[in-house]
Amino acid sequence: MSRVCQLTGTKANNGMAVSHSHIRTKKLQQANLQQRRLWWAEGKRWVNLRITTRALKTIQKKGLGAYAKSLGIDLARL
């Protein structure tokens, strides 16, 4: 399974790890993905999603159906 958020499409970021002596090495910063089973009220069913914690906070604020609609995602396919 790929490490990509199913709603936002967030994936890993290429960054640098900088030591105390300022030696820089490449580092991969992974997205904070969580496997969640969320209730989709409009579809009257549970939906299993692998989403970032940022997307989870937005879902708690807006609701799953409204957030997916704003992103242009059809939850019926998931």
Swiss-Prot record:
GO terms for biological process: translation. One of its GO terms (molecular function) is structural constituent of ribosome. The keyword Nucleotide-binding does not apply. One of its GO terms (cellular component) is ribosome. InterPro entries: Ribosomal_bL28, Ribosomal_bL28/bL31-like_sf, Ribosomal_bL28_bact-type, Ribosomal_bL28_sf. Keywords: Ribonucleoprotein, Ribosomal protein. It holds the Pfam family Ribosomal_L28. Belongs to the bacterial ribosomal protein bL28 family. HAMAP family: Ribosomal_bL28. This is Large ribosomal subunit protein bL28. It comes from Synechococcus sp. (strain WH7803).
